[in-house]
């Protein structure tokens, strides 16, 4: 049948709606990350009954599925002691003569511009298990990063 004879409401011609991709691997979270996920689920659940636009309802339901899945699979990481770099730690280091501070967090909590980087990011992986005073290879350079300080973040 010709497209001219189809109703405008046929969903066949709509752009496909994809689910939000869930990062591979474990869903490690800090206490803050778990609280953020729980708050997002509560926010979406509260907003859903108030939405009137069908497209917005569909998008909100999709978002809610994502955040409920993240909440259901969240694994609260054990508290770090700050002796070595591990999930949840803040790390101050020197790279290319510049000092930086990052905190290793879960995927959903990551905000690189704020210094919160995902534990699966290449920089995080390079830093893992390092100790103060260690020099680490990164970006194809030996001794590219010097670990200056490690701080265990509050998980309560």
Q: Language-model segments: which ranges?
A:
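Non-DNA-binding regulatory cores of transcription-related proteins
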Residues: 78-148
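Short, compositionally biased
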Residues: 148-156
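Amphipathic alpha-helical coiled-coil segments
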Residues: 65-81
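Helix-rich terminal scaffold detector
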Residues: 1-70
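Short, Lys/Arg-enriched charge-dense amphipathic segments
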Residues: 3, 15-16, 21-22, 27, ...
């Amino acid at each position: 049948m010709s497209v001219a004879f189809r109703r405008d409401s046929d969903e066949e011609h709509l752009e496909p709606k994809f689910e939000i991709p869930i990062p591979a691997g474990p869903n490690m979270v800090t206490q803050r990350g778990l609280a953020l996920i729980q708050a997002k689920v509560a926010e979406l659940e509260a907003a859903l009954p108030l939405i009137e636009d069908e497209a917005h309802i569909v998008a909100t339901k999709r978002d809610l599925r994502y955040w409920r899945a993240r909440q259901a699979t969240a694994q609260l990481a054990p508290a770090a002691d700050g002796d070595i770099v591990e999930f949840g730690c803040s790390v101050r280091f020197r790279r290319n003569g510049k000092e930086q501070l990052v905190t290793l967090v879960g995927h959903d909590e990551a905000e690189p511009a704020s210094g919160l980087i995902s534990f699966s990011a290449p920089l995080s992986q390079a830093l893992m298990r390092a100790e103060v005073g260690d020099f680490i290879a990164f970006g194809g350079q030996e001794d590219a990063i010097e670990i200056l300080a490690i701080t265990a973040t509050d998980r309560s």
